From Swiss-Prot:
Entry annotated with the keyword Membrane: yes
Its membrane topology: Lipid-anchor
Residue numbers spanned by region Disordered: 1-86
Naturally occurring in which organism (per UniProt): Saccharomyces cerevisiae (strain ATCC 204508 / S288c) (Baker's yeast)
Name of protein: Lipid-anchored protein YDL012C
């Protein structure tokens, strides 16, 4: 399948044109602002300056708490099982048995 078969002929594409007017019933108050207030006058300049000065203090206070909230990962340590002292003897017996069986098969 070619790209032209998949997407179709470029001549059959429809072009989009922007509408010339807003839909009926559209008002400026629907944007979230009151019609009498503008976005620039919503906050007084003094409050914006105070908020800007308070932000570094807020982050400085929160940083130690942020790092303390994460619990530490547990450390897993593999421990050897308690030995009764006869593992060396069992390994020696097994090696001797293997040696005897091998010599028995050869001779």
């Amino acid at each position: 399948m070619s790209a032209q078969d998949y997407y179709g002929n470029s001549a059959s594409k429809q072009s989009y044109s922007r509408p010339s007017a807003p839909p009926p019933g559209y008002e400026t108050a629907s944007r979230g602002y009151a019609p009498s207030q503008s976005q620039q006058n919503y906050y007084p300049p003094q409050q914006q300056q105070q908020q800007y000065q308070q932000q570094p203090q807020y982050y400085q206070q929160q940083q130690p708490q942020y790092y303390q909230q994460h619990p530490q990962q547990p450390i897993y340590v593999q421990q050897q099982p308690a030995s009764s002292g006869n593992e060396d003897c069992l390994a020696g017996c097994l090696a001797g048995l293997c040696l005897c069986c091998t010599l028995d098969m050869l001779f």
